Amino acid sequence: MPGISSPILTNAQGQVIGALPWVVNSASVATPAPAQSLQVQAVTPQLLLNAQGQVIATLASSPLPQPVAVRKPSTPESPAKSEVQPIQPTQAVPPPAVILTSPAPALKPSASAPIPITCSETPTVSQLVSKPHTPSLDEDGINLEEIREFAKNFKIRRLSLGLTQTQVGQALTATEGPAYSQSAICRFEKLDITPKSAQKLKPVLEKWLNEAELRNQEGQQNLMEFVGGEPSKKRKRRTSFTPQAIEALNAYFEKNPLPTGQEITEIAKELNYDREVVRVWFCNRRQTLKNTSKLNVFQIP
């Protein structure tokens, strides 16, 4: 109401923390009496303090004024509850269950299902012949069994002439081109070649081999002229030492592991062996000793 001031509440530091309300007598307000006859009653508040002594609220505890007759409402209102409702603890929400699902196993191709072969995976004659229940003719009408037999006989006939794959490859390269090199001859004999390539090589190799056999019947020199190289040198037979010779050589080696040329000649004459054989024996013996000393370094005592 105008003209009425409320008492102010302050704390120990002089800070304003609230104001005390004034209660006006409702009975006097209801009458049309002049404003100066109004009765004002002071309300004595009760202060609410916290643990630190600070005022947190005020409660009015003075007697209430005389009630005024009021028409009872049609619907009773529920009295306000002054009790502080306890805070119900919220139920802990369980964490979402994690379900681990194993991936579906990959379907294994059935053993009976045929595997498609691309152009880069063309099977060789050896792979086709080695498979069980393989027809003798492939898709292009090439007789695989005939090629296999010819490759086997070609190798036997080549060795009987004393020719190597390199000699055959050099002779064919000079007359037919680089497609008939030593590597091509090697793959053909091992059947490590596609059926089409084998079918292309077969007539050329057969013609050349027949000609080489005719030249060989006329003489080894004619064959070498046809092949275009010197006769192949036979490998020298390996020399075997007797136990007495080995004992004598070891005795010489203990005295002098690196003999001079004159000393090697004298040892060879004494043991009745070729000088080159004795020289090679000393070289091999020194290399064996060197390798043995290297191994001893890594041995744990």
Swiss-Prot record:
Keywords: DNA-binding, Homeobox, Nucleus, Repeat, Transcription, Transcription regulation. Gene3D superfamilies: Homeodomain-like, lambda repressor-like DNA-binding domains. The keyword DNA-binding applies. One of its GO terms (molecular function) is DNA-binding transcription repressor activity, RNA polymerase II-specific. Residues 66-88 are annotated as: Disordered. It is found in: Nucleus. InterPro entries: HD, Homeodomain-like_sf, Lambda_DNA-bd_dom_sf, POU, POU_dom, POU_domain_TF. One of its GO terms (biological process) is regulation of transcription by RNA polymerase II. GO terms for cellular component: nucleus. Residues 234-293 bind DNA. The keyword Transcription regulation applies. Sequence repeats lie at residues 11-17, 50-56. Residues 139-213 form the POU-specific domain. Residues 11-56 are annotated as: 2 X 7 AA repeats of N-A-Q-G-Q-V-I. In the embryo, widely expressed, with highest levels in the developing brain and spinal cord. In the adult, mostly found in the brain, where it is diffusely expressed with the exception of an enrichment in layer IV of the neocortex. Also found in kidney, lung, heart, adrenal, skin, and placenta. Low levels in spleen, muscle, liver, anterior pituitary, testis and ovary. Pfam families: Homeodomain (PF00046), Pou (PF00157). Its main location: nucleus. SUPFAM superfamilies: Homeodomain-like, lambda repressor-like DNA-binding domains. Contains two direct repeats of 7 amino acids in the N-terminus. Belongs to the POU transcription factor family. Class-6 subfamily. Transcription factor that binds preferentially to a variant of the octamer motif (5'-ATGATAAT-3'). This is POU domain, class 6, transcription factor 1.
